[in-house]
Amino acid sequence: MSRIGRLPIDVPAGVDVKIDGQAVTVKGPKGELSLTVASPIEVKLEEGQVLVTRPDDERESRSLHGLTRTLLNNNIVGVTQGYSKGLEIVGTGYRVAQKGAGVEFALGFSHPVTVEPPAGITFTVEGNNKLTVAGIDKQAVGEVAANIRKIRKPEPYKGKGVRYAGEVVRRKAGKAGK
């Protein structure tokens, strides 16, 4: 058995889990998320716990077992606590500003870069060089944060660019002068 897959998922108070065939819907105080479970995996709700089981020890079943359990757990944590990812903007003249629901970046380009949040994602700007991406879907929060970082990745010589909060950027020595 998968060490992760066999662990039961506790369903906290205020969270409603509905299992309809291969579709699992999780409803909580922050919103609603759904997941389509791959065919060999079975999901059961017993005594306030969600159990994920597999019918056999085939390679596909083994690989999907732990994955399905983790995705369901991420959904339950998402609708109760939510997820957030912090970004820092480093560099002279590099800044971020809130523009309605979206944000506008000045990152050394000839034009400002505007990013609008997809459904279920919110942006919070602290100061002019810190941004927090928040939402209930862990995958969507990480993807939006990665797309923002991709606009201007931290460069290795001065470290300028958009980086995750707490990210350590490997620095290189500049060229040796005479």
UniProtKB/Swiss-Prot annotation:
GO terms for biological process: cytoplasmic translation. Keywords: Ribonucleoprotein, Ribosomal protein, RNA-binding, rRNA-binding. GO terms for cellular component: cytosolic large ribosomal subunit. InterPro entries: Ribosomal_uL6-like, Ribosomal_uL6-like_a/b-dom_sf, Ribosomal_uL6_a/b-dom, Ribosomal_uL6_bac-type, Ribosomal_uL6_CS. It holds the Pfam family Ribosomal_L6. PROSITE patterns: RIBOSOMAL_L6_1. One of its GO terms (molecular function) is rRNA binding. This protein binds to the 23S rRNA, and is important in its secondary structure. It is located near the subunit interface in the base of the L7/L12 stalk, and near the tRNA binding site of the peptidyltransferase center. HAMAP family: Ribosomal_uL6_B (MF_01365_B). Belongs to the universal ribosomal protein uL6 family. Part of the 50S ribosomal subunit. This is Large ribosomal subunit protein uL6.
